[in-house]
Amino acid sequence: MNKLSTKLVVAIGIGAALYGILGLWGFSIAPNTFIKPALAILTVFGALFGPVAGLLIGLIGHTVTDTIAGWGIWWGCYPTLLNCPLH
């Protein structure tokens, strides 16, 4: 298994921070259509640094967005499997 280089770890940190903060904003161009410019950051970083970086940036950045926005961390909360309360 390859180790993560310092360059890749820094790119993941910067990408996740940008994606997490900018993921809070977007704009509507038509009814039921919402565009988030932060998705471009995820696409560019994934193309430049590879799929592992893209996966980690998306996972960490989306968790940051959900936490800052007050929606909370949702993954792993399936009441039928884990008896986890949804409220």
UniProtKB/Swiss-Prot annotation:
UniProt superkingdom: Bacteria
InterPro entries in UniProt: ECF_substrate-spec-like
One Pfam entry name: ECF-ribofla_trS
NCBIfam families in UniProt: PRK13661.1 (NF010182)
Entry annotated with the keyword Nucleotide-binding: no
Name of the molecule in the record: Putative UPF0397 protein BC_2624
Residues spanning the membrane: 9-29, 40-60
